[in-house]
Protein backbone atom coordinates (compact mmCIF):
# COMPACT_ATOMS: atom_id res chain seq x y z
CA UNK A 1 0.00 0.00 0.00
CA UNK A 2 2.82 2.46 0.81
CA UNK A 3 4.31 1.89 -2.63
CA UNK A 4 1.06 3.12 -4.17
CA UNK A 5 1.48 6.48 -2.44
CA UNK A 6 5.11 6.78 -3.52
CA UNK A 7 4.17 6.01 -7.12
CA UNK A 8 1.22 8.43 -7.08
CA UNK A 9 3.39 11.16 -5.52
CA UNK A 10 6.07 10.62 -8.16
CA UNK A 11 3.52 10.80 -10.95
CA UNK A 12 2.15 14.06 -9.54
CA UNK A 13 5.65 15.56 -9.34
CA UNK A 14 6.41 14.43 -12.91
CA UNK A 15 3.15 15.91 -14.19
CA UNK A 16 3.86 19.28 -12.57
CA UNK A 17 7.51 19.30 -13.68
CA UNK A 18 6.56 18.55 -17.27
CA UNK A 19 4.17 21.51 -17.19
CA UNK A 20 7.21 23.72 -16.53
CA UNK A 21 8.91 22.39 -19.66
CA UNK A 22 12.04 21.47 -17.71
CA UNK A 23 13.87 18.16 -18.04
CA UNK A 24 14.55 16.08 -14.94
CA UNK A 25 18.19 17.09 -15.15
CA UNK A 26 17.53 20.83 -15.39
CA UNK A 27 14.89 20.77 -12.67
CA UNK A 28 17.05 18.72 -10.28
CA UNK A 29 19.97 21.10 -10.84
CA UNK A 30 17.71 24.10 -10.24
CA UNK A 31 16.55 22.78 -6.84
CA UNK A 32 19.95 21.42 -5.78
CA UNK A 33 19.07 17.74 -5.99
CA UNK A 34 20.97 14.92 -7.67
CA UNK A 35 19.29 13.97 -10.96
CA UNK A 36 19.33 10.25 -10.22
CA UNK A 37 17.74 10.86 -6.82
CA UNK A 38 15.07 13.07 -8.38
CA UNK A 39 14.45 10.48 -11.09
CA UNK A 40 13.86 7.82 -8.44
CA UNK A 41 11.38 10.15 -6.68
CA UNK A 42 9.39 10.53 -9.90
CA UNK A 43 9.54 6.76 -10.40
CA UNK A 44 8.03 6.19 -6.95
CA UNK A 45 11.14 4.44 -5.65
CA UNK A 46 12.07 6.89 -2.87
CA UNK A 47 10.44 7.62 0.45
CA UNK A 48 11.39 11.27 0.24
CA UNK A 49 12.05 13.56 3.21
CA UNK A 50 9.94 16.60 4.04
CA UNK A 51 12.91 18.88 3.30
CA UNK A 52 13.18 17.49 -0.23
CA UNK A 53 9.41 17.68 -0.73
CA UNK A 54 9.62 21.38 0.15
CA UNK A 55 12.51 21.87 -2.33
CA UNK A 56 10.41 20.31 -5.08
CA UNK A 57 7.33 22.36 -4.20
CA UNK A 58 9.36 25.57 -4.18
CA UNK A 59 10.95 24.70 -7.53
CA UNK A 60 7.54 24.03 -9.03
CA UNK A 61 6.14 27.18 -7.40
CA UNK A 62 3.31 25.23 -5.77
CA UNK A 63 2.35 24.54 -2.18
CA UNK A 64 3.43 21.32 -0.51
CA UNK A 65 -0.24 20.36 -0.24
CA UNK A 66 -0.58 20.73 -4.01
CA UNK A 67 1.94 17.91 -4.46
CA UNK A 68 -0.40 15.61 -2.52
CA UNK A 69 -3.53 16.56 -4.44
CA UNK A 70 -5.63 13.52 -5.40
CA UNK A 71 -3.40 11.00 -3.60
Question: What kind of region is each of these model predictions?
Answer:
Residues 1-19:
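A short, Lys/Arg-rich alpha-helix, primarily the initiator
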Residues 11, 21-22, 48-51:
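Residue-level signal for the short linker/turn that defines the boundary of a DNA-recognition helix
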Residues 14, 25, 54:
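Residues within the helices of the helix-turn-helix
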Residues 18, 29, 58:
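Alpha-helical residues within the helix-turn-helix
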Residues 53-57, 67-68:
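Hydrophobic micro-packing sites on short alpha-helices
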Amino acid sequence: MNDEYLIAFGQRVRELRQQTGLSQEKFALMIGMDRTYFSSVEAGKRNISLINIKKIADGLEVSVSNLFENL
